[in-house]
């Protein structure tokens, strides 16, 4: 097997993203399965990690749409990346964007946009990849009757009016949700300008209804608006590594998507490895042998001499055992190009792998460049600091770095592991939290929850130990005991009082300490603004001498406690508490001119 015929336009590369259980895999399987059914012998080519649906098959499936969407297809077809989800999509990376030309964002039409959908939208935005929305599971809409057609438009015309109204309601909900994310969206058959509006295509991955429109819109959009990007380049290949695998009887191979140019056997290629750029020679280009079923075909590989973009192939070469998934792969025609691409790769990898010893943040370890980049980007959006981000298993160094962080900032003493495990013999100490997951959005959720839990726990502990601002007035006529200890009725005018809080007068003199607080004859651990409670106060104090009925007292807040409150826990400081703080500062400054200096009240 040696040849492929060069094309004027290459096939667009399509990825499928969306929330878990919204039907990504089912939709992809339906598209592939439908294409297999509709093909003629020789029409479908098998690829590694991808499925090519040729134009002839797209035209057959979308035959019912000829009148609605008249378009003469010039692209050779569509290349679908086989594994859905943004974990693998992350590896389809290239400088300034993505290897993917367009995406299908699968959304359950009943459930609408969910957390992982938002994560997918964020990564599509960051990689500047346009997308269409497949509003899946229309068969779940109440009263929907499945029709024997791949066309949504044919099917909707045969539904009862109430079912159509139901569908419109769900589509409208989706339009609103997408608008909240900054996208103007509409049902595809109501769009006038596809450059300004995201197309929503109602579909059932289960019955196949809507598959015709999905393929037709994908083909039409890419052909009409991406011609320059899709122009076939005759030059040396550029690609990206999806996965690195060990093949029995052969050795390490790389599953590669070629998005530009031609890759030939014996080409010199430059790619990223764990320890730096790898320069090696292509020993073999492998593709699955043609079989009826694409999935079955993947186990039986055949060699070809060259491959044109866009294609998914398996590349066998020496020294691939340390190659990084998500790495660019370049064909170099001479030594000068080898050095040029080594430098480019070094810069790209350095931009993703990260270490900053001055940052007390989390440690991130991932299995590929793409997933690491996606996780770092996701953490940055959430304002979670990162100390170290790298590829590969968890090492002793990672533990040491996490321990340093945990000493200073317990909430960030985390090792976040994406599809990697600790090296053999490495144990995670108790003070370090290992958070591991195979789905990015779940990893993010777990990291955020842990940080929040630790912060809340630390906050509770700290607020138990510091003195908070409080202001009370001794209510005239409510003196139950005049001394040793004094027991009086008080009104809390602002802030909070608690047992063990010291009390001061307006002139700054300390009069004693709160022993106990009772509300309706029941002991309570605090009293806040507006409450009238009985308090016992111990110290050198007597009502009528050191304090008077009707007198106002303040909690004795140490300078350090006020600093902690205003710098770390300002969110609990109420308006009435701020007024009390200002009064306490005025009192305290008669004895300490630096008390409360530099505090921000806004």
Swiss-Prot record:
InterPro entries: EFTU-type, P-loop_NTPase, Small_GTP-bd, T_Tr_GTP-bd_dom, TF_aIF-2_arc, TIF_IF2, TIF_IF2_dom3, TIF_IF2_dom3_sf. Residues 18-25 are annotated as: G1. GTP binds at residues 18-25, 82-86, 136-139. Residues 204-206 are annotated as: G5. The keyword Oxidoreductase does not apply. Residues 82-85 are annotated as: G3. Pfam families: GTP_EFTU (PF00009), GTP_EFTU_D4 (PF14578), IF-2 (PF11987). GO terms for molecular function: GTP binding; GTPase activity; translation initiation factor activity. This is Probable translation initiation factor IF-2. It comes from Sulfolobus acidocaldarius (strain ATCC 33909 / DSM 639 / JCM 8929 / NBRC 15157 / NCIMB 11770). The gene is infB.
